[in-house]
């Protein structure tokens, strides 16, 4: 069987990972990535998570590995090569010091980086910043170079003095090297004035490069010292190369750097593709999973557990069934290889083996047919798969007679279920869909198809078998009705199954629309509840402020009364009791009076329809409570200030708006909408018609395949706002229009 990694396109995942590696070591590890033991894979997941939260810089490990390999082979490295290797080791040790304090999985990997201090110290002493060997590299080299410098200067002084004495004989006043010996440029016709050895001449022949006899011995001595210098430099470089080769910590350092690069590449892949860390358990449960190799892939959620071990997926061709199989297979392989997986959340079992029969794997050498190739792979599954295995089978039962293929496929599914195997299977065979419906251990599923647009949506629908849509598409494309009816008659069982599936689909869409309506209502109630809570909080705050102000007012009034009483007592004492009593009675009457109740706000009365601008909602006045108005908004009652509500113009004060409903007809055009969109429009139209007091609603849905009409009627049948519904008269739209009578 073709390697499952190839079948599931895992090498393409490796390639994406290798693109994100920064060193040859990391790229090689990425391209060789394969499933690991569980403990090691989980450690890689931990490392990837830490690399996502803690980015770090990597040294140039490729240069280090190349230099180390050459040194091991006995080569003498150049100064720059040794310097680059030393720099990489120094950066590796710095990275180790950076990661060790983290005390996590990354720090454990960093512990593998060795201590290369002896080699680094020797390199720093021997080489300068350009990689040239320094004088201090050895006493002998220092001595040789001490002799070289004055000798070189002595040669230059003699040659410049010679040129100054015979200026006419020289082309230019400069000293140059030819054959590693110092010489001067002499005009071709003046050679007799400069006795010496001809070393070279210019291309034009106008200049001769002559080594004067006066510096021959000095040049000879200089050449001898240079040979000694070169010999000592080579010895020093050879010594450094041997020190690098003998550093036993280098291989472990390279291994640690390679893994740190791979982990960083895995983190980059997870960040770029939106992957998440998987958890492991006894079942497969993926939430919003997607194919990591398909741009903008549709996300789907599904589960494989003891109740539903096998998912049987059906539906139209090119609808995404095979991609879904690969989505699960790649998620498992990526998780077992230490990668994050393509899902928002993933719980995965750890299969002992993944079996995949996907695509045409016909063997030309063995001359096997497509069907025989499938059987060969299926036989391996039946013989070897265990309850801990994962099987992925594409187009089970294809490539042979449909009846025999269906019978054989059912037997294979029964055998796999008996073994307790978990997996995904795709098929076009209707008998297999019927077999899976209600069968323990296996669940029907399908890939959704948009009949209006005639294209797949790639969305997985659990619990519902898929349809071929051949007849539905033919009807949508206006094939003659008599041909379609004859086709349905020729396939009675298939026709009944398709009709059943069509009804199930319509019911499912109606239920989805109902659920969406309830969700919107619940969301609206929650918004109202929140707004009411905020209003109550503001009210309590204002009430507390008013109480405080009232207390201060009462306190001030009491002080005033006390002052007046004191004055009256004084007056009674000095002027007589009768006048004081008269003033006391007047004071008592003043404080005994009650303020008249405030008049009701204009335009507001029980039953009046009002708008609450702060909520964007309408409600009805229930009661006037002094300075507040009790308003019914949907299922909630709330106390509001008069300025917080606005009477609607058409409302008559004191009378409910619906006391005299207008018997108008509202018409809604649903043609061209999807089923879900149409059902939302119908729900909104029913709500508006009820608020406006309409008695009738006309829904224009067209005839088409009938799926939209059936879905709408399923929703109307469940709606408590609807009294009845029927087709419009033949002259007013007939089957293409549904007339709805609303409850009063």
Curated annotation (Swiss-Prot):
The keyword Cell cycle does not apply. Disruption phenotype: Disruption causes an increase in the frequency of recombination between perfectly matched sequences. It comes from the Bacteria. PROSITE patterns: DNA_MISMATCH_REPAIR_2, SMR. The keyword S-adenosyl-L-methionine does not apply. Its EC number is 3.1.12.-, 3.6.4.-. Gene3D superfamilies: 3.30.1370.110, P-loop containing nucleotide triphosphate hydrolases. Nuclease activity is stimulated by interaction with MutL. ATPase activity is stimulated by dsDNA. GO terms for molecular function: ATP binding; ATP hydrolysis activity; ATP-dependent DNA damage sensor activity; endonuclease activity; mismatched DNA binding; ribosomal large subunit binding; rRNA binding. Residues 668-743 form the Smr domain. ATP binds at residues 315-322. GO terms for biological process: mismatch repair; negative regulation of DNA recombination; rescue of stalled ribosome. Changing residue 701 to A: 140-fold decrease in endonuclease activity. Pfam families: MSSS, MutS_V, Smr. Keywords: ATP-binding, DNA-binding, Endonuclease, Hydrolase, Nuclease, Nucleotide-binding, RNA-binding, rRNA-binding. Homodimer. Interacts with MutL. Binds to stalled ribosomes, contacting rRNA. Belongs to the DNA mismatch repair MutS family. MutS2 subfamily. Contains an N-terminal DNA-binding domain, followed by a dimerization domain and a C-terminal domain, called the small MutS-related (Smr) domain, which is absent from MutS and contains the endonuclease activity. The Smr domain can also bind DNA. HAMAP family: MutS2 (MF_00092). Endonuclease that is involved in the suppression of homologous recombination and may thus have a key role in the control of bacterial genetic diversity. Cleaves the phosphate backbone of oligodeoxynucleotides non-sequence-specifically at the 3' side of the phosphates. Preferably incises the branched DNA structures, especially the D-loop structure over the Holliday junction. Has ATPase activity. Binds to dsDNA but not to ssDNA. Acts as a ribosome collision sensor, splitting the ribosome into its 2 subunits. Detects stalled/collided 70S ribosomes which it binds and splits by an ATP-hydrolysis driven conformational change. Acts upstream of the ribosome quality control system (RQC), a ribosome-associated complex that mediates the extraction of incompletely synthesized nascent chains from stalled ribosomes and their subsequent degradation. Probably generates substrates for RQC. This is Endonuclease MutS2. It comes from Thermus thermophilus (strain ATCC 27634 / DSM 579 / HB8).
């Amino acid at each position: 069987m073709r390697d499952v990694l190839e079948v599931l396109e895992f090498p393409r995942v490796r390639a994406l990972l290798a693109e994100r590696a920064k060193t040859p070591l990391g790229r090689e590890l990425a391209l060789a990535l394969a499933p690991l033991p569980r403990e090691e894979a989980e450690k890689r997941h931990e490392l990837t998570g830490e690399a996502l939260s803690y980015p770090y810089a990597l040294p140039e490990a490729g240069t280090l590995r190349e230099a180390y390999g050459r040194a091991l082979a006995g080569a003498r490295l150049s100064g720059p090569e040794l310097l680059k290797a030393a720099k990489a080791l120094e950066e590796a040790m710095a990275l180790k010091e950076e990661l060790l304090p983290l005390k996590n999985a990354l720090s454990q990997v960093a512990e593998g980086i060795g201590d290369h201090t002896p080699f680094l110290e020797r390199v720093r002493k021997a080489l300068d910043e350009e990689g040239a060997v320094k004088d201090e590299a050895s006493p002998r080299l220092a001595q040789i170079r001490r002799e070289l410098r004055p000798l070189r200067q002595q040669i230059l002084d003699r040659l410049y003095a010679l040129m100054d004495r015979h200026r006419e004989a020289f082309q230019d006043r400069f000293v140059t090297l030819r054959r590693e010996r110092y010489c001067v440029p002499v005009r071709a016709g003046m050679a007799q004035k400069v006795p010496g050895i001809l070393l070279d001449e210019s291309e034009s022949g106008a200049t001769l490069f002559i080594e004067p006899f006066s510096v021959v011995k000095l040049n000879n001595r200089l050449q001898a010292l240079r040979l000694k210098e070169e010999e000592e430099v080579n010895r020093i470089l050879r010594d450094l190369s041997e020190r690098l080769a003998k550093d036993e910590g280098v291989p472990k350092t390279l291994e640690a750097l390679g893994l740190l690069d791979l982990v960083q590449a895995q983190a980059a892949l997870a960040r770029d593709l939106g992957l998440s860390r998987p958890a492991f358990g006894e079942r497969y449960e993926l939430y919003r999973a997607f194919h990591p190799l398909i741009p903008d892939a549709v996300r789907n959620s599904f589960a494989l557990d003891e109740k539903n071990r096998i998912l049987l997926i059906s539906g139209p061709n090119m609808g995404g069934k095979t991609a879904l199989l690969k989505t699960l297979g790649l998620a498992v392989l990526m998780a077992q290889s230490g990668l994050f997986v393509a899902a928002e959340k993933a719980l995965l079992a750890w299969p002992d083996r993944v079996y995949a029969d996907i695509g045409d794997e016909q063997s030309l050498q063995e001359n096997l047919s497509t069907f025989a190739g499938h059987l060969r792979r299926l036989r391996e599954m039946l013989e070897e798969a265990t309850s801990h295995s994962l099987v992925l089978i594409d187009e089970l039962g294809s490539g042979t007679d449909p009846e025999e293929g269906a019978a054989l496929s059912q037997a294979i599914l029964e055998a796999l279920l008996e073994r307790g195997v978990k997996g995904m299977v795709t098929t076009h065979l209707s008998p297999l869909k019927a077999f899976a419906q209600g069968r323990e251990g296996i669940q029907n599923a399908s890939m959704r198809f948009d009949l209006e647009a005639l294209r797949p949506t790639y969305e997985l629908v659990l619990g519902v078998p898929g349809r071929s849509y051949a007849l539905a598409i033919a009807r949508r494309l206006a094939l003659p009705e008599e041909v379609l009816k004859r086709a349905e008659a020729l396939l009675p069982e298939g026709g009944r199954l398709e009709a059943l599936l069509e009804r199930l689909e319509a019911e499912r869409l109606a239920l989805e629309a109902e659920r969406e309506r309830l969700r919107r209502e619940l969301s609206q109630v929650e918004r109202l509840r929140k707004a009411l809570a905020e209003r109550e909080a503001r009210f309590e705050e204002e009430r507390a402020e008013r109480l405080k102000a009232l207390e201060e007012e009462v306190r001030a009034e009491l002080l005033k009364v006390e002052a007046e009483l004191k004055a009256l007592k004084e007056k009674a004492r000095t002027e007589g009791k009768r006048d004081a009593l008269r003033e006391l009675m007047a004071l008592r009457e003043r404080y005994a009076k009650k303020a008249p109740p405030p008049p009701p706000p204009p335009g507001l009365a029980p039953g009046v329809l009002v708008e609450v601008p702060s909520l964007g909602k309408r409600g009805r006045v229930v009661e006037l409570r002094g300075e507040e108005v009790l308003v019914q908004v949907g299922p909630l009652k709330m106390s509001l200030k008069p300025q917080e509500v606005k009477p609607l113009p058409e409302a008559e004060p004191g009378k409910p708006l619906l006391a005299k409903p207008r018997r108008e007809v509202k018409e809604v055009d649903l043609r061209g909408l999807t089923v879900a969109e149409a059902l939302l429009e119908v729900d909104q139209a029913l709500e508006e018609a009820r608020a406006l007091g309409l008695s009738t609603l006309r829904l224009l849905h067209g005839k088409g395949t009938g799926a939209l009409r059936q879905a709408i009627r399923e929703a109307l049948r469940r709606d408590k706002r609807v009294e009845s519904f029927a087709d419009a008269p033949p002259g007013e739209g007939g089957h293409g229009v549904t007339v709805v009578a609303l409850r009063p």
